[in-house]
Amino acid sequence: NCASFGGIPAAAPAPTAGLGVDQLVTDKPVINLPGCPGIPEVYTNTIVHYLVFGQLPELDELKRPKSFYGVTIHDRCLRRPFYEAGKFADSFDDEGYRLGYCLYKLGCKGPTTYNACASIRWMNGLSFPIQSGHPCLGCSEPGFWDGGGFYQGQSAPLDRPGLTAIGAAAGAGVVVGAGMAVANRAQKRGGGEKVE
């Protein structure tokens, strides 16, 4: 993260005005590979991509390879089903934590952090913070040191897409069903055929 976005030297109120390499080197292409610590496979695969194809990989707006930083930790998190079900750990010593519930209320930044931790993992694929019971700190995002307390709980869960889709489908079903009921009543009064 230090080479990509300035890291601790750039954190407030540091007097150093630390910068990322891409803010200093403006006449050459720069690829940011943030993470604290970084994932070795991300480094090696990015280098191999350049050696094999002779070009930089596709990058996001922060100059990170989309193949590794294209989805959030949350998108691939093994605790995501608990998030969708609304099951959260409220403290590091409660029943929800022991059962492996989502760590969002314990400050997990996985929903807003783009990195490959949940798919590649660290230490030769052994684990990553959330799998080991620790909330994501958001270390691959700019300014993560200034992004609030690491264990500061999130006040309300983000929109849960699965539940939103279910709610929208249920609402549409109610509207269609009501429309059919009204049409059937009108048909019965007029002696027409039943609407299906």
Question: In which residue ranges do the predicted regions lie?
Answer:
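Catalytic cores of nucleophile-dependent amide-cleaving enzymes
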Residues: 1-33, 37-39
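Iron-sulfur (Fe-S) cluster-binding modules
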Residues: 26-32, 46-196
